[in-house]
Amino acid sequence: MALSLTGCTHEGPHTGCDEGSLNLLFTYDGNTASFDQTIAEDIELYLYDGQGKKMDERHIPYENIKGGKPYPLELSYSGNAYLVAWTLTGNEDIKKTSPALHDDESYSTARFSMGEHATRLSSAYNGSMQELFLRSMAFTHNRQENRILSVDVQKQLCSISVTIEEGSSFATRYPGTLSIAIYGSSHSYNIAEDKQNGSRIVIEDSFAYIESSNEYVAENKVMPASVDSATGQRDNIVVTI
């Protein structure tokens, strides 16, 4: 996709640029009407050059893009670049690291362990990249060209479920702590330093017992966690006893 990200949309003499030559139009499910504050209250936008160096970082309030309002972007650059954006909901300070320019790795494999006791995976792990969208593009020096890039937000809500085969003995043998090792790329996660070892992520969490459903439930501490806009439910680690 050839896009102009330098110069102005005006022809002839003028005193400045009111708008950038690239407009970003945020959509959800392919239309602007579906993109509201239940999808994102703010946008964190990052631009990287072809070598992975961050060129620009912007915080875009929802008010600036609501109702399908185009967001003008102006930057002097020529060459291949990457546009990465995160949607933010609530008062979260996520400080995500962009996965741009890293090799794609499978987020479908998760390995679970609880001490020396083997557990079995009862549902696949789909990744937890909260509403991430990523586009690559080529920037040109065409100063008169005005383009609109529609960026569709894709939600990736996931759930991690582990079934303990001994049943109710879990409560006495493993009192409330589950260690989970997720193998795969961790560039899109914000992990405490003592929980990070290369591409291996170790999550340690305490569970609360839900008597009505006979489950130990804890919120996934891997950030960012996906959020279902309809229910407000976040990614959870669910252990059935």
Enumerate the predicted regions with their spans.
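Bacterial signal peptide processing site
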Residues: 9-12
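Structural beta-strand segments of beta-rich domains
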Residues: 18-24, 158-160
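Structural motif
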Residues: 26-39, 163-172
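Secondary-structure boundary elements
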Residues: 139-145, 154-158, 165-176
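Conserved "repeat-terminator" motif of extracellular CCP/Sushi domains
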Residues: 150-157, 222, 226-228
